[in-house]
Each structure stands twice: as C-alpha cells, then as structure tokens.
C-alpha cells in the first residue's frame, strides 16, 4: 500500500481542519493582504524577489540574456498573483520581460496604468508600453532583437522553457501557501452557504448563480461550476448546470480563482431523507477520497495511489466507476497543472497543491490539499458541516457528509 508514515498519519489528520489566516480582503489581487509577520516569507514583494532569483539561475543555466513570459499562468506566478482583467483579446494581454536583475511589464497604453495601480504597485516592475494600435508583437520583437532569449512559448528563435517554468511554479512558496489558505475557505463557504439556504425547486442555473455571487462578493472568481440535481451527474460526470429543478438532492462542485491560484471542492444537500442509492454512492465516494488523502505525502507515486483507490472502488461495489471521471490533479497557477493518470510515476513533492475528486454514481467527494512533510493539509475546510469519520489503515479522516434539510 502507498500510505506513508502510518504511525504519524493519525496525529497529522488535524491538518485536514486547517483554517485560513485572518486579514482577507475582497480584492482579486494579493498585494493589499499580508500576514502580520512580513518577514516570514509571506510578503508579496519578497516573493517576487525570490522568483527573480530563480529566473536569474534559469538564465545562467540556459546561457541567455532574458526571459519573455506571455502565458497568463506564468504572469500570475511571477507577479505573485497579478492578473490582466478585462482584456478580451489574448494577443493584447500583458507580457513580462526578465533579465538576471531587472524585470519589466510589457503592456498596452490602455492597460498599463491599471496594472500598476491595482495589480503591481510596489513590486519593482518597470514598464515597456505599446500604443494600442501597434499590437504587442512589434514591441516584443524590438525588445528581443539581437538578444539571446528564452520564453514560455515559441517566438522567433527563442529557446522554449515552458516545462522548466511549469516545474518551478508548481512548488508553492510560503506566500502562495498563505494565499491558498485564504482562497480555500471562500470556496467551502460558497458551497455550504448555498446548500444551507437554497430552496427546493430552484434550478441548477439558479444554484450556480448563488455560488458565483458568494465568490464574487468576497473577491474570488468562479472558474468552473457544476450543479447536478437528482442524479443527473450519473449520466454526465462533467455536468455543468441546466434549467432542471432541484427536488430531492443536489451535488455541486466549484472551482474558484483568487491571487492567481485555484481551489476546488464539492458538497451535497438532500431535501428530506436521502435517496438510498445516492447515500450508498456518497458513502463509497467518501471512502475512496479518504484512501487518496491518506497516501498524499511527498515522494508518493500517483500510480500506486490510484491503484489503491481502484481497490477501494472494488471493495465498495463500484469496481468500474473510476473509469468514468479523472480522480485527481495537481493544481496551482492553472486549475489543472497535471492530471493524475494510472500510469503517472512522477513523485509528489512537498508544497504542491492537489485536488482529489472521487466520483461514484451521482456522488462526488472533492477537496483541495497542500502536500506537506507533515501530511496532507486541507485547503477547502468545512465550516459548520456534517462530517463522516473514516478509518484508513488505522488513521482517521473526516470527509464532508450529506447535509439533510
């Protein structure tokens, strides 16, 4: 079995209840939120400077003068949470240019002022601005002319280092972990408050609207919303939402973005006594997710963890259900940084974000965690929610149960 450090798993199960730091703010950018001790590695400017040093090392290794960054996920990573909101044309998105000791934002005259006022103030970036009628490519070509460059996507003769950047950004820094622990409870709150207050007979679409409102009200952005009424998710595991009314029960899964990071969670509510078939599916999904969580340690191999999950699927009487939906993925600056497949052998690393998504019939058991040396730390903790106690090889885990109304 892939479970590590069995003797320590029970004591570290408290990490499944970690709550967010205080001091959250209802803005999308993290520069106005800091923990009390800015010297602990959670200060945003210090985080950007640390990434500058990583880029300097990458440039030295590649023997190049500069790095061009165009992909939005890398923009968010290297600015520690910056975002180009309100830019519908991907070719007009801002870019970044790094040398070993300096950094620039490449932006249009339409967006430059807002970026520096609301996203990047005080972070040490300089500006290279293009008139909106020029387009980004002309300025980038001029800036990189006769320079030996690396970039995160193919451009002229640049060496592409997308894989190297992906590996670097998956390792969440202390600042990013602090931001992660603010985002997660916002996702949990949106799901649980909606389950507690929604009425029967409202449509899946109205449920999705409530989830969106609760996120946006607190400065988080809904990315993916799935609402399944009365077993619709048995037919469609990635179900979106429709005009179907909720009569007996509802399962909802929510992915949100804040500080350029992503977290996902699910909850389910029943009106009246739960449908016996659905309750059996939900109980099985909770056991399977607990199996995954118990093995979420640094150096664990996804292939082995998924094999253990398949064994639990068989034990619960749902042998083939794992084939119908992805079971988990690494998350961070993209909603899905890497899907976990039965063939995946890349070992987990400490400070990766991970989402486990067990699905059985109409039921989902989904949450996001931080992989740490002390065990899996729950990023999307329940607030005031019924919990199901599950033992895995002697260790106890708590999974969100059905809310009965």
Task: Give the residues covered by each predicted segment.
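Active-site neighborhoods and metal-handling regions in enzymes and metal-associated proteins
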Residues: 10-405
